[in-house]
């Protein structure tokens, strides 16, 4: 069995496809004020690494692009670094810290707490994130 990097597929002995990608070479990058999302398409899914700089807030950085009252993308995230405070539309508020895994339904705002960038890997909800008209 061989493993192909990048956009290539390798076929395992049983006909299964093996893919290996790296966030250092994303398929797409979406930039917005004080942040960016690096997207990788793999196994039929879109995985995103989001980097939010200090001072980033969804309501001011992404809302003008999304044109929705709050973030409508559900998220299933692993929090790599920094602190991300989340405010749900129902009023629940909590912090996501390094090592946390969060499952957020649509209907929320979020912002970086402190002076360290918040970095998350999102396994759901990145397909249309920070895309005009979402």
Predicted features, each with a name:
Residues 1-51, 59:
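A short, N-terminal "cap"/entry segment at the start of jelly-roll beta-barrel domains
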Residues 2-9, 13-23, 111-134:
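Double-stranded beta-helix
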Residues 39, 47-51, 76, 93, ...:
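Conserved hydrophobic/aromatic beta-strand scaffold that supports enzyme active sites
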Residues 49-71:
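Conserved short histidine dyad/triad with adjacent acidic residue
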Residues 52, 68-86:
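Short, conserved beta-strand element in jelly-roll/cupin
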Residues 57-58, 82-87, 110:
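Short beta-strand segments in beta-sandwich/barrel cores
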Residues 88-108:
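Short acidic-glycine-tyrosine-enriched beta hairpin
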């Amino acid at each position: 069995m061989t493993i192909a990097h990048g956009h290539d597929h390798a076929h395992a002995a049983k006909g299964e496809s093996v893919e290996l990608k790296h966030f250092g070479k994303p398929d797409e990058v979406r930039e917005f004020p004080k942040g960016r999302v690096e997207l990788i398409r793999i196994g039929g899914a879109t995985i995103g690494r989001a980097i939010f700089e200090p001072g980033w807030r969804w309501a001011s950085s992404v809302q003008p692009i999304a044109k929705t009252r709050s973030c409508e993308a559900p998220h299933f995230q692993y929090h790599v670094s920094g602190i991300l405070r989340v405010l749900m539309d129902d009023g629940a508020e909590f912090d996501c810290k390094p090592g946390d895994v969060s499952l957020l339904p649509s209907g929320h705002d979020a912002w970086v707490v402190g002076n360290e960038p918040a970095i998350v890997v999102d396994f759901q909800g990145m397909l249309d994130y920070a895309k005009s008209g979402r």
